[in-house]
Amino acid sequence: MPKHNALRVMSVSVATAGALSLGLTGPAAHASTPLDYVALGDSYSAGSGVLPVDLSNLLCLRSTANYPHVIAAGTGASLDDVTCGGAQTKDFTEAQYPGVPPQTDALDAGTDLVTLTIGGNDNGTFINAVTACGSAGLLSGGKGSPCKDKNGSTFTDQIETNTYPALKAALRDVRAKAPGARVAALGYPWITPATADPSCFAKLPIAAGDIPYLRDIQAHLNAAVKRSAEETGAVYVDFSQVSEGHDACADRGTRWIEPLLFSANLVPVHPNALGERRMAGHTMEVLGLD
């Protein structure tokens, strides 16, 4: 099956630079036969908001410094990056935009490696939660847990009822179209700390009691990704430990996720360039590509 927007990332200079940036040395960093690597997923995979922008399809807000490109540079893989900002699981099998084919069209029997981050946009669950809690936080002056009080288990119920089965179906489709591939489903790095930090309110205007509430929603989403991966033979890449302390409330240079306000990214509440590099590095470590 023809590849879409296939990007050959096999230049020695580019691959060497990527390997050095991740601390990769020796033959493990470069396979003798380049991996046929397809990257799927949403804005966390696409690196939306991270410069430089991939000009091949501006609708997808894809960065050429996203974690798929870092992985490809570090391994010498042949990358077909079909990630797209705003993607939902349904966009694996449906066209997301005119001229943007279903993402799994990029897969075939020759695909060796697939990575993906997906599920956060399904039913608008996570963006709706962040928006609702941000609005409630501003209105409450950061006090109490107005978002939790109003929404209760609405968001986690949506994840369990809708997102989890959709994730499982999407991963099954990936497996059917790329039966010989290693499939890595990445969790989402922490957006909020475990407990409220009063100094963070100016950057992330979430009420103190809603910080753990939002984190619990994200934990449910990651659990759904993990369960789906385990049930379909994919590898789950867990960021719950390695991203601790690198949330949107951390200082610039430490955080992997940019805050809602005063973001250094073009797209807030998304990984910055450091976050994309760290997502790549941890994924390579889990997959034994380091």
Feature locations, PLM:
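Serine-esterase "nucleophile elbow" of acetyl-processing enzymes
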Residues: 32-86, 104-105, 133-139
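Charged, often glycine-rich, active-site loop that binds/positions anionic groups
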Residues: 87-104, 249-263
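Oxyanion-hole/transition-state-stabilizing segment in secreted/luminal serine hydrolases
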Residues: 48, 98-158, 190
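Short amphipathic alpha-helices and their capping/turn segments at secondary-structure boundaries
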Residues: 26-38, 96-115, 168-182, 284, ...
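Secretory targeting and sorting signals
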Residues: 1-31
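Structural recognition of the beta-strand scaffold that forms the well-ordered cores
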Residues: 36-41, 45-46, 78-83, 112-117, ...
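Conserved N-terminal glycine/acidic-rich loop preference
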Residues: 113-116, 139-175, 184, 189-236
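Catalytic His-Asp segment of secreted/periplasmic serine-dependent ester chemistry enzymes
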Residues: 189-290
